[in-house]
């Protein structure tokens, strides 16, 4: 990806804003997706992508092209590209759910639930099924780092089939760890002492 490809090119962000193309930002994201994995190359993912930048290309389109590029590199000799592709898909998911500053931290699960309930995507009553102290305990069990353990095939299934989303627009509203924990919280909502007996931790322990 040569710097000359940025000349005058504008990209459209997920929030509708338009800004100059930043190839360095793309490269850093691919590097992060490859971090700690043997037998993979960020440069190879970028070259394989063959992205043709044009004015108005969306960041979502760029992300999906990079995901496909990494997934196309998966073979018997380079199996770790399945994790590169998964991470690139995950980064796009995080941006969609939390915005561009997702890497600064994830919202408390109770905050995420209440916001989702206001938007009509979660049951309004679930937040009241547990005390604030119980929600704090539930939040402490969530380890978003587990998302990094997904293979591409596994995460693709979760994203396409199970996460809460608008099927008409494709907009996603939650991440895998929130999904697992909120499903568990719903199942055990009427069980006495469900939190103290740690029933709710089971789905996240077995999340991959």
Enumerate the language-model features and the residues they cover.
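Single conserved hydrophobic/aromatic residue that forms the stacking wall/gate
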Residues: 199-208
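Extended catalytic cores of very large enzyme megasubunits
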Residues: 1-200
């Amino acid at each position: 990806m040569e710097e000359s490809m940025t000349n005058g090119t504008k990209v459209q962000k997920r929030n509708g804003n338009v800004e100059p193309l930043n190839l360095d930002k793309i490269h850093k994201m691919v590097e992060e997706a490859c971090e700690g994995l043997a037998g993979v190359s960020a440069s190879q993912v970028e070259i394989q992508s063959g992205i043709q930048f044009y004015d108005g290309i969306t960041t979502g389109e760029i992300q999906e092209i990079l995901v496909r590029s990494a997934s196309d590199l998966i073979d018997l000799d380079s199996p770790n590209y399945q994790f590169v592709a998964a991470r690139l898909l995950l980064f796009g998911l995080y941006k969609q759910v939390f915005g561009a500053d997702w890497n600064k931290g994830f919202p408390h699960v109770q905050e995420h639930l209440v916001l989702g309930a206001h938007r009509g995507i979660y049951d309004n009553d679930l937040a009241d099924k547990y005390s604030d102290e119980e929600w704090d305990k539930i939040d402490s069990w969530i380890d978003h780092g587990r998302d990094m353990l997904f293979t591409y095939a596994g995460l693709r299934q979760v994203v396409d089939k199970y996460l809460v989303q608008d099927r008409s627009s494709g907009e996603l509203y939650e991440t895998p760890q929130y999904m697992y924990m909120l499903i568990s919280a719903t199942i055990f909502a009427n069980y006495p002492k469900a939190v103290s007996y740690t029933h709710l931790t089971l789905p996240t322990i077995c999340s991959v």
